[in-house]
Amino acid sequence: MKSIVAKVLAVAAAMTLAACAVQPATHADLPQTVKTVAPDAWSVDAPKDTVGADAWWSQFGDPTMHRLVDIVLGDNLDVKAAVERVKQAQDITKQQRAALAPQLDAGATAAYQRQNTPPPLGYVKQAGVGLTASWQPDVFGGERLAVLAAQAQVTGRQSALDELRLALAANTAAAYIDLRWAQAQLQIINDNEQIRSRALKLTQERLQYGLSTQLDVARAQNQLQDLQAQIPKIRSDIQHDMSLIAVYSGRTPESVGSLLIDEARPIPVPAQSVPQTLPSEALLRRPDVRTAYATVEQRAAEVGVARADRYPKFRLSLSDGILASSYLGMPTLTDNLFSVALSATSPIFNAGRITAHIDENESRMRESQLGLQQTMLNALKDIEDTRSDLVNGDAQVAKLAGALDASGHALRLSNELYKGGASSFLDVLAAQEAYLRDAESLNQAKREHAQAAVALYRSLGGGWDAPADGDVAKTQPSTDVAAN
């Protein structure tokens, strides 16, 4: 009967202690938090298609850009450093989890010493070996919450790694688009240089026959030289973009030739549609939102850890060993050393330190929740803005293409009329300026349209895959033959 009562009391005591275990600070999960912020639909209409946000850089129809982004994601040094930070957080979690388990240590000792204290024993020989086990039971859950906080930190660093990859893919694509824009700009200048050179030659020939004036020749020379003055700056921009891409890929600017991007190609043309996704889905996909929510989870667990400091802490120690001693020529004496100890400490007076620590962690959690809400608001703004830029950019490219055709036709007509003496050279100069302006405007519009698509995919959180729990996404070196 007594044994039954003892068991009942033991179970009741265990249940009581379990009920006293602290919990993380309460907070809504990520889907619920997103629902409080995300609208039901986007305010800007855009053509929708089954195009996805994963590996979006492959959807521009430019194999060189596709290959470059893959190389950068595999070889970038910042990505490799971020992978190491994830591993560090995982190791911290293992250390925190190890604190929940008992610790077992082995010890050995050997001594040979002279003892002169009464009674004099002469030289004493001692040797011993033993085991020591210790365990600090997590009765009130503080250590388990520390593990939870460490796991949230792992999640946050993994999301930060995804965010870095997404930003790096977008920055690489943007630099590649800038490079193609600069190369196209150089081609436009070269084409217009030929047009203005022919105009200068024409005015010089007409001057010989008295059909033109020195003023026309001077104006033609001025137009040509102004145009030629732009070439060094554009070539410098091309070199800057190539060097930037090389650094993104973990290479020195001198090795940029291995990336095979020095040959001019057209600006990549983005798809005319956007991925079908709801605002809530886009927010859940964005790595910066996940990083912010992981911070909320970490802060909530840290609140529980701070609250656990109010409760007692227990420690159980057990040791066992053998000690052998020999002195005065007597036979060796052995002794079995065994001890068990249970200790407990509980805070009584700390001048409000624990309460202040709890308040600090609760404030940090509220701060992280506000940061999460602000991150989601910024994300929604980014998506809406980039959707608008993509739609309007497509229309702008179409309009400017028509304007360039018209200015090209006007340039041909002005040259013919000038040759026939039906118009002045000022008309030719005006037509040249209009043609150059429209060509540069169309080139810039194509650049902005492609950049808007890159920004949209980045704002949608595309270009990364959520890893399995506890896994660090591997960073594989590229297999670029040219680089090797």
Pin down the residues of each PLM region.
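Hydrophobic, lipid-facing positions within transmembrane beta-strands of outer-membrane proteins
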Residues: A127-W135, A175, L278, F338-L342
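Transmembrane beta-barrel outer-membrane domains
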Residues: G122-Q126, L333-L337, D438
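A short glycine-centered flexible hinge/capping loop motif at secondary-structure junctions
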Residues: L207-L211, Y418-A422, S459-G463
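Short flexible linkers and secondary-structure junctions
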Residues: A21-N171, K313-L318, I348-I358
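Terminal intrinsically disordered/low-complexity segments used for targeting and assembly
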Residues: K2-G74, Q151, R235-L284, R290, ...
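Sec/SRP-type N-terminal targeting helices
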Residues: K80-A81, R97-A98, P137-R165, L215, ...
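Structural signature of outer-membrane beta-barrel domains
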Residues: A111-Q115, D241, G321-S325
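Periplasmic alpha-helical coiled-coil/stalk elements that build and connect Gram-negative outer-membrane
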Residues: S3, E143, S159-L278, D389, ...
